[in-house]
């Protein structure tokens, strides 16, 4: 019985990491990309997102609750999984370890980012271009955001590989090998988008 629960918990964890959390990540990166066009373009994009109907319901049920489940169960997996990269020097095993490490970094980064933006907004702060520019004016915070964004993107991109295996999309060694390179390409592409947005605020 406990084995069945574990199976379904892991399936749900895998699903929520892509739908809706992963989709939200991509949407967030796209909105932040408007910063490269200037403060006015970014503020307009941010205002559009803030003006969505049922925004709070969407944030709670489509973003925060799935994210909390994925994060909590992900921490459990990170501290109970047996890492074998030291024993087997294969790229997939190292990616397995990095998935767990970046998951913890992502949790810290996202928690801090939510505090600095969403919680601050509820306390009266205006989330706009100037807010992010002020945050990233600190070299320490700039470094923190670079590491955080890259970790988040890697965790999502590499997680797509696990998602494909978990849901029976890639079942053969060849398809899984191809999937590894595809997800690494996705990581590089999204990293470019994320870093471009960060440096647009600097």
UniProtKB/Swiss-Prot annotation:
**Biological-process GO terms, alphabetical:** tricarboxylic acid cycle
- State the compartments where it is located: Cell membrane
Pfam annotation, one family:
Sdh_cyt
Q: In which pathway does it act?
A: Carbohydrate metabolism; tricarboxylic acid cycle
Single Gene Ontology MF annotation? metal ion binding
| Stretches that traverse the bilayer | 12-31, 60-79, 93-113, 135-155, 178-196
Q: How does it sit in the membrane?
A: Multi-pass membrane protein
Please list the residues that bind heme.
28, 70, 113, 155
This protein's GO CC annotations: plasma membrane
Q: How does it assemble?
A: Part of an enzyme complex containing three subunits: a flavoprotein, an iron-sulfur protein and cytochrome b-558.
Q: Which family does it belong to?
A: Belongs to the cytochrome b558 family.
Please report the name of this protein according to its UniProt entry: Succinate dehydrogenase cytochrome b558 subunit
Q: Which organism is it from?
A: Bacillus subtilis (strain 168)
* Phylogenetic lineage: Bacteria, Bacillati, Bacillota, Bacilli, Bacillales
Whichever gene encodes this chain, its name is: sdhC
């Amino acid at each position: 019985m406990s084995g069945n629960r574990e199976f379904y918990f892991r399936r749900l964890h895998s699903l929520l990491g892509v739908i809706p959390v992963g989709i939200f990540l991509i949407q967030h990166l796209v909105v932040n990309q408007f910063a490269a066009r200037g403060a006015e373009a970014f503020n307009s994009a941010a205002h559009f997102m803030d003006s969505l109907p049922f925004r709070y319901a969407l944030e709670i049920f489509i973003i925060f609750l799935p994210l909390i489940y994925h994060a909590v169960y992900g921490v459990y997996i990170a501290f109970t999984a047996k890492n074998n990269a030291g024993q087997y020097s294969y790229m997939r095993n190292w990616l397995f370890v990095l998935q767990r490490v970046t998951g913890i970094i992502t949790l810290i980064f996202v928690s801090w980012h939510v505090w600095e933006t969403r919680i601050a907004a509820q306390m009266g702060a205006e989330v706009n271009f100037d807010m992010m520019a002020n945050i990233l004016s600190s070299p320490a915070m700039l470094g923190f955001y670079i590491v955080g964004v890259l970790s988040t993107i890697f965790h999502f991109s590499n997680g797509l590989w696990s998602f494909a295996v978990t849901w029976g999309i890639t079942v053969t060694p060849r398809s899984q090998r191809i999937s590894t390179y595809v997800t690494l390409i996705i990581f590089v592409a999204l990293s470019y988008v994320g870093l471009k947005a960060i440096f647009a605020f600097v």
